């Protein structure tokens, strides 16, 4: 992949941007959307350059979270498995629903067939808000680029259905850039989307 056109690799159209091994001196931060399975080599790379990191990979395990937490003592680390702020507004809404009184709760997610983790990190995050184990999440992979998460609560005589859809994955890139503007001069610490969203909404 090194020295290949990033546009040619991802979109089959050259864009003048080349994959390089080294960062330029004026790099402000690193945004990482790559596969989380290479975490050890990534951490070695992050330590070498000591730049703030927005870590957008999904599917990291507890050990990976501990490694990133330790890394945040050396440089600012922002963990954002989903860079859409509306997902975190949705999570707050789910917490406000009295899930314990529901007779049945279901969570489903649909992503492009190239997505590796099943279920997605976002689906697991949403399931955690209502106490659903990840093996109960319904997973669908399709040829569509849409990302869809659905949550259904069934009560005695009522049903609540919530759906969040992303129709174009550029939403994630735009979200990452908004985070970058807020984050790149922050002090060494571990950051999450909740803090970012609360500050945007004027909460401390």
Predicted regions and their residues:
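Rossmann-fold NAD(P)-binding glycine/threonine-rich loop
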Residues: 37-44, 56-79, 84-88, 92-97
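Anion (oxyanion) recognition and catalysis
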Residues: 47
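Structural motif
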Residues: 33, 57-58, 193-194
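Rossmann-like NAD(P)-binding element
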Residues: 22-41, 51-52
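C-terminal substrate-binding/catalytic lobe of Rossmann-fold NAD(P)-dependent oxidoreductases
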Residues: 1-27, 101-204
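Short glycine/serine/threonine/alanine-rich loop segments
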Residues: 51, 75, 132
